[in-house]
């Protein structure tokens, strides 16, 4: 048989959700059939599912294990649904570098760049604060910060971006374009002293590790 669940925890508070998730694990263990679980929450999908299918505009764009999706996404939809906060259009420059028009920068990559590369992704917690210029190091300004219990989410604007393909957009002109020109950086508040956390208006240097980017062609 087939058991189908469509976002069963979407309206629950965090405590109740965690309790019911454990009940659901017991149910799955006792059920001898196929479970079709629909979710927009990647962590939820990873906890419950052996294989994950990415669906975009009604079609499956990729399917694999949770590890495949998180560490080796094959499509832009997969990059985004895996929880990657930074995903942007990419143009191949050479075998080891790409141009990222919306960000107005070029970036080096450890992996070979496909001839038909479509996009680059980098997770917000992979970004590194550095002291100054270097490979994949960029001067940025902290344009916005927001705090959760244990993390600070930081919106970074590139200060020396190339505007030839995508002129800089202000927040008041077009909010979505403004956001797409920025990097999202997640800072662990438990690992960084409070007086060293990035704050709005601060200028600093950030590094995109070449070995931590995803390159996809669809």
Predicted segments with their positions:
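Generic structural "secondary-structure junction" signal
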Residues: 11, 18, 83-84, 129
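Non-catalytic connector elements of ABC transporters
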Residues: 85, 96-218
């Amino acid at each position: 048989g087939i058991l189908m669940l469509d976002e069963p925890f979407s309206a629950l508070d965090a405590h109740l959700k965690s309790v019911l998730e454990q009940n659901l694990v017991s149910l799955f263990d006792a059920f001898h059939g196929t479970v079709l679980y629909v979710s927009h929450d990647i962590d939820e999908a990873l906890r419950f599912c052996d294989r994950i299918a990415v669906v975009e505009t009604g079609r499956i764009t990729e399917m694999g294990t949770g590890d495949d999706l998180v560490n080796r996404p094959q499509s832009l939809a997969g990059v985004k649904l895996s929880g990657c906060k930074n995903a942007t259009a990419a143009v191949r420059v050479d075998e080891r570098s790409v141009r990222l028009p919306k960000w107005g920068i070029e970036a080096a990559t450890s992996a070979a760049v496909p001839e038909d590369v479509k996009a680059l992704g980098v997770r917000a917690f992979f970004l590194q604060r550095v002291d100054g210029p270097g490979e994949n190091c960029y001067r940025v300004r902290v344009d916005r910060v927001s705090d959760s219990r244990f993390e600070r989410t930081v919106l970074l604007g590139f200060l020396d971006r190339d505007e030839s393909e995508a002129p800089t957009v202000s927040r008041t002109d077009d909010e979505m374009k403004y956001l797409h020109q920025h990097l999202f950086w997640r800072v662990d508040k438990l690992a960084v002293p409070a007086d060293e956390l990035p704050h709005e208006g601060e200028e600093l240097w950030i590094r995109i590790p070449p070995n931590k980017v995803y390159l996809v062609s669809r």
